[in-house]
């Protein structure tokens, strides 16, 4: 009775310990999608919020200058204002990546590796080609089947002209 009680307690302790071990992992911060977020996307060109939300003193001064006439702004100031609002331009978003080179390279690597495996298998795993694949053997087997008149109605021998000793046309 004492042994069964001890095993029962040990079992409960083991189960509760494993649950605690599984449950004590790091806390995952949940994203609140109720608030607008910034994203550079071609199909959604005007995000809900600006790229830079915490403005520095120079950026705040530039935003105040933006409220005046835009002809007084220099080209660099206009670019800085654009970069406050957007992270990338359409040209930068549409710029091709070099990821295709990696994909093609990996595909070629695996094709080459597979070819090496096949060459190794042909050299060391597979035996010699059976003699039944030899042209002479196939010719003798064909002649034997014709001599035996194998499947004379719809099959092999039906396509042979025994009078002319040639295949029917």
Swiss-Prot record:
Function per UniProt: Component of the cytochrome c oxidase, the last enzyme in the mitochondrial electron transport chain which drives oxidative phosphorylation. The respiratory chain contains 3 multisubunit complexes succinate dehydrogenase (complex II, CII), ubiquinol-cytochrome c oxidoreductase (cytochrome b-c1 complex, complex III, CIII) and cytochrome c oxidase (complex IV, CIV), that cooperate to transfer electrons derived from NADH and succinate to molecular oxygen, creating an electrochemical gradient over the inner membrane that drives transmembrane transport and the ATP synthase.
Mitochondrial intermembrane side stretches: 126-169
Residue list for modification N6-acetyllysine: 29, 60, 67
Modified residues (N6-succinyllysine): 29, 60
Protein name (database record): Cytochrome c oxidase subunit 4 isoform 1, mitochondrial
Mitochondrial matrix compartment spans: 23-99
Topology with respect to the bilayer: Single-pass membrane protein
Keywords per UniProt: Acetylation, Membrane, Mitochondrion, Mitochondrion inner membrane, Phosphoprotein, Transit peptide, Transmembrane, Transmembrane helix
UniProt source species: Mus musculus
Transmembrane spans: 100-125
């Amino acid at each position: 009775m004492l042994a069964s009680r001890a095993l029962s307690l040990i079992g409960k302790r083991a189960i509760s310990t494993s649950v605690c071990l599984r449950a004590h992992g790091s806390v995952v911060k949940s994203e609140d999608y109720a608030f607008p977020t910034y994203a550079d996307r071609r199909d959604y060109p005007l995000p809900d919020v600006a790229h830079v939300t915490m403005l520095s003193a120079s950026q705040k001064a530039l935003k105040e200058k933006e409220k005046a006439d835009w002809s007084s702004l220099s080209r660099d100031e206009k670019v800085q204002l654009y970069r406050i609002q957007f992270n990338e331009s359409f040209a930068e978003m549409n710029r091709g990546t070099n990821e295709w080179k990696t994909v093609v390279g990996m595909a070629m690597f695996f094709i080459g590796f597979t070819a090496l495996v096949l060459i190794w298998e042909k050299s060391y795993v597979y035996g010699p080609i059976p003699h039944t694949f030899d042209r002479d053997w196939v010719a003798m087997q064909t002649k034997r089947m014709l001599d035996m008149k194998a499947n004379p109605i719809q099959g092999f021998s039906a396509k042979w002209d025994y009078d002319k000793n040639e295949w029917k046309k």
